[in-house]
A protein has these predicted regions:
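Conserved catalytic core of the tyrosine transesterase superfamily
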Residues: 1-3, 23-25, 35-37, 69, ...
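Short pre-functional
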Residues: 1-13, 122-123
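The alpha-helix within a helix-turn-helix
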Residues: 5, 16, 135
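Conserved tyrosine-mediated DNA breakage-rejoining catalytic core shared by Y-recombinases
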Residues: 8, 17-54
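Short, polar N-cap/turn motifs at the start of nucleic acid-interacting alpha helices
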Residues: 21-27, 110, 126-148
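Catalytic-site neighborhood detector that most strongly recognizes the C-terminal catalytic loop/helix
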Residues: 34-36, 138-163
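Major-groove DNA-contacting interfaces characterized by cationic-aromatic clusters
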Residues: 50-99
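Short, basic (Lys/Arg/His-rich) helix/loop patches that form interaction surfaces
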Residues: 78-136
Length: 165
């Protein structure tokens, strides 16, 4: 299910409730829950080869999680990430009680269901997909908010834009 999130760019509340009837012509057709309040906006996501392989593995029926199971889902994902060796130390800054504080954690501790969405946006951007197109799939309405999702470290940025120098 985590990989489906990475392949679709959807929120947990959406990728955890995908049903077989949401698939048409090798596309996922879904109305994200968050946008229902703002007017139903269907999102159509072409299925990647990886997405199709996962669907085939489960005969078109993906596991479903209720919103109440999000904490459990995140715990399982973190355990998997720890077990596969995502134990690098990462340092970042966080606003705590109005102060900017340097935080050090192990990489797996920061992985969650929301990592899927950030991964989707970052990978599509690195492949050269225009930001406006990615936003259509991810449901972002403001480029400012979308750009916060991109996780481009210095090395990835240099790799992506090397041709400009």
């Amino acid at each position: 299910l985590f990989l489906i999130g990475c392949e679709s760019g959807l929120r947990f509340s959406d990728y955890s409730r995908i049903q077989p009837h949401d698939f048409m012509r090798e596309e996922l057709h879904i109305v994200p829950k968050k946008t229902k309040k703002q007017g139903a906006k269907k999102v159509i996501i072409p299925l990647s080869d990886r997405f199709k392989r996962i669907l085939n593995k489960y005969n078109g029926v993906l596991p479903n999680y209720e919103r109440s199971q999000l904490t459990r889902f995140n715990k399982i994902i973190r355990e998997i990430c720890q077990n596969v060796g995502m134990n690098d130390e990462i340092k970042f800054y966080r606003e705590i009680a109005g102060k900017t504080v340097k935080v050090t954690k192990l990489k797996y501790e920061e992985v969650s269901s929301h990592t899927c969405r950030r991964t989707f946006c970052t990978l599509k951007f690195l492949k050269g997909m225009p930001a406006q197109a990615i936003m259509k799939f991810s449901g972002h309405t403001s480029e400012r908010n979308f750009l916060k999702y991109l996780k481009l470290d210095a090395e990835l940025t240099a790799q992506k834009y090397r041709g400009y120098f």
